[in-house]
Amino acid sequence: MGVGSHESAALVLSRLTDCPVRDLVVSGPDMDTDQLAHMMVVLKGAQGRHREVVEPVEVLAAFGGFEVAVMVGVILMAASKRHLLMIDGLPACAALMLAARIAQPVTDYCVFCRSHNHRGLDQALNQFRASALRELGMDSTDGTGATLAWPLVKCAAALLTEVADGEDPGPTHPGSLPEPAREALPFGDSLP
């Protein structure tokens, strides 16, 4: 993501949700107070300059960066094709909020992920009444949580689509199993 993307995302989310921008930019108790004070002066100035902007596309034009605009387009297109969306980070949440104001059903295709413990992300997830798929306590860059959650999502999809149901329980005779599965049978029998 680009420099300033979290601040831009905080402005977008603040305007669309009436959540105070300060709650979205504060990363945690260790954030430098002088840095926060300066940031708040700049962000409040941007909010004041665009105080009458409320429509999603206008909010995007006033506060969003290029990367947020691209994500809004990708989210809308992916949801229109019923693709799964992995949402990770404040800029992705801002893009999703904009997309949801344009076409609300996009949130039906979302799995929320988390790469760090930024307090502003807590506020953003609360706006969607969502929690992250996994809370790993990482302090990494946006997207890491989605990358780590992807294998879990793939496994869940496989369970839903590939596991035999009650009508077709699969092979009943060990001889009809592929070689690796036959070798695993004695090990499975030894488990408590």
Predicted regions and their residues:
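N-terminal loops that bind phosphate or other acidic moieties
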Residues: M1-P192
